[in-house]
Amino acid sequence: MAHVPARTSPGPGPQLLLLLLPLFLLLLRDVAGSHRAPAWSALPAAADGLQGDRDLQRHPGDAAATLGPSAQDMVAVHMHRLYEKYSRQGARPGGGNTVRSFRARLEVVDQKAVYFFNLTSMQDSEMILTATFHFYSEPPRWPRALEVLCKPRAKNASGRPLPLGPPTRQHLLFRSLSQNTATQGLLRGAMALAPPPRGLWQAKDISPIVKAARRDGELLLSAQLDSEERDPGVPRPSPYAPYILVYANDLAISEPNSVAVTLQRYDPFPAGDPEPRAAPNNSADPRVRRAAQATGPLQDNELPGLDERPPRAHAQHFHKHQLWPSPFRALKPRPGRKDRRKKGQEVFMAASQVLDFDEKTMQKARRKQWDEPRVCSRRYLKVDFADIGWNEWIISPKSFDAYYCAGACEFPMPKIVRPSNHATIQSIVRAVGIIPGIPEPCCVPDKMNSLGVLFLDENRNVVLKVYPNMSVDTCACR
């Protein structure tokens, strides 16, 4: 008896596979696009920016969960791009001279992810021009292709499925809080956002919100991004921390000594002893009175006089106030006659090397001084912020070319020094010599350039300020 093979059920026809293939390709494209890195041109993608999101999902009940450092670095990257832009173009940021960034702190309030911003570091002299809120917008959890296949749809009376509604919208809520309350505060604004097809960075203008909050003295803002797609009770914050940029015009930046007021964190010469804080001229110690008089010529452009104190008195005076340790070493036992004979030649050779080194240094300094023009001109000066102790909070630049003006303004003054009419008359009167004691005009900066500085404020927020009159362009006799 012949064996008849069992008949198997036919597989899916090739026509059905051809019909489903475009749909699956569309589904794969939407799913891949939902996990794409940020597409905003101003900020590069961060490879490990999801670490904070994973930590929050692992511990959803944490009331003070914060995002990882890579998510917060997006603020530093954006501010550095602004610094490079305005340093290269020489323009003013947003029509002003200050850009402040404020990082977000993530907290879970009532099972919702809320971002808090502390704007209290803004100065009273800073007039707000614009404020922008930068956030990473995620795609919807149900892409359109997947929503067609998997999401249940309502049906009409005849049993046919109803058409899909518009994509789910997100709501961005802003509230202001006072420092004396723990509630969510007053609702300052709300925005409806359409979810993008893929994750990208967006920026929204919140100038009225920030200005109103500052006017009312409520500089603690909260931002909350809600979506109807989110499951209740499961906070799903953005994998990248949002931040706020405030463009302002600092009216006090042109005041005298403004760069030291904003950038100097401490006194470079701290007084540990209360004695220097008293009026030196009223002190009974004559050495203190002479020290106070020695600082006068620095303020009246006169040459300082010689101090009659011996060097040892200088050292004892400064050592008393602990400005620096005493330069004098302890006396060693006097060596014997034989030891002095052995070391005599070595001491002579060492002294000769020091004298040769000093002579070479002096010759080099003299040649450099001879090469420089004696007339008033711009001289080179490079300032390194590490030398003055400001490198701990200044991000960029590390150093800059400040230049300075030096040289003579003698009669007759050439046109290259651009003398003013008053300087010309003063030089003539000095040359004639009728009125004694008239000094020659001074070599001072004529045109100066501004400098953008990127630094950290007291709250560790990145700030960009454009300081005027930081670098000498030309010099003149005045």
UniProtKB/Swiss-Prot annotation:
Expressed in femur, brain, lung, skeletal muscle, pancreas and testis. Keywords: Cleavage on pair of basic residues, Cytokine, Disulfide bond, Glycoprotein, Growth factor, Osteogenesis, Secreted, Signal. It comes from the Eukaryota. Residues 34-368 form a propeptide. GO terms for cellular component: collagen-containing extracellular matrix; extracellular space. GO terms for molecular function: cytokine activity; growth factor activity; protein serine/threonine kinase activator activity. Disulfide bonds join 376-443, 405-475, 409-477. GO terms for biological process: cerebellum development; fat cell differentiation; negative regulation of ossification; osteoblast differentiation; ovulation cycle; positive regulation of osteoblast differentiation; response to kainic acid; skeletal system development. Residues 1-33 form the signal peptide. Residues 266-319 are annotated as: Disordered. Glycans are attached at residues 118, 156, 281, 469. InterPro entries: BMP3/BMP3B, Cystine-knot_cytokine, TGF-b_C, TGF-beta-rel, TGFb_CS. It is found in: Secreted. The keyword Disulfide bond applies. Growth factor involved in osteogenesis and adipogenesis. Plays an inhibitory role in the process of osteoblast differentiation via SMAD2/3 pathway. Plays an inhibitory role in the process of adipogenesis. Homodimer or heterodimer. Can form a non-covalent complex of the mature region and the pro-region. Belongs to the TGF-beta family. This is Growth/differentiation factor 10.
